[in-house]
Amino acid sequence: MNKGIIGKKLGMTQIFLEDGTRVPVTVVQAGPCVVLQKKTAEVDGYSAVQVGFETVNAAKANSADRGHCVKAGKGVFRHLRELKLEQEAELNIGDELTVQQFEPGDLIDVTGTSIGKGFQGVIKRHNFKGGRASHGSRFHRAPGSIGCSATPSRVFKNKKMPGQMGNERVTVQRLQVVRVDADQNLILIKGAIPDSKNNVVVIKDSVKATK
């Protein structure tokens, strides 16, 4: 991964391109993020950088957080994330990552937490068809049989059944950067991304970046 940054989802809107095309976009306030720690393969077993986003009052942070951020000299940060960047060796503690590393047309992957839907049935959770809506069937939204008979006398793992839906880590791939506003640290991404408004998402180069 060559590029990466942490941002806060602000919401969705729509913009018009020069040819008049209307494009739905998600607005993300991305960075600036400060490099707080470098992890190397020799010491940690892998190479990455830990970055901080959104400063907070140092008086509200515990001593461990204050001590961890003091080397960067940029304050104490609310959100810490690790990014595996190829240019990890070129980054030093205290360096900043900004939206200027992205350009319109770039393909990115966005990682966030999907919105929780609570306990849901198989029709909403797994797109089951459901039974006939006829009189006397008594089978409308039920999942049906979940296993076999005496052999194997159990329910197989990963069987699609009712349960908790959403509220899990999700990555949406190959989203396109429509516009970058370096003055306000905003990046406009085509389409929808995971997570709710004002929550933190991770933006990075797409692993399927072929245009």
Swiss-Prot record:
SUPFAM superfamilies: Translation proteins. Coiled coil: none annotated. One of its GO terms (cellular component) is cytosolic large ribosomal subunit. PANTHER family: 50S RIBOSOMAL PROTEIN L3 (PTHR11229), LARGE RIBOSOMAL SUBUNIT PROTEIN UL3C (PTHR11229:SF16). Belongs to the universal ribosomal protein uL3 family. GO terms for biological process: translation. One of the primary rRNA binding proteins, it binds directly near the 3'-end of the 23S rRNA, where it nucleates assembly of the 50S subunit. GO terms for molecular function: rRNA binding; structural constituent of ribosome. The keyword RNA-binding applies. Pfam families: Ribosomal_L3. Signal peptide: none annotated. This is Large ribosomal subunit protein uL3. Keywords: Ribonucleoprotein, Ribosomal protein, RNA-binding, rRNA-binding. Part of the 50S ribosomal subunit. Forms a cluster with proteins L14 and L19.
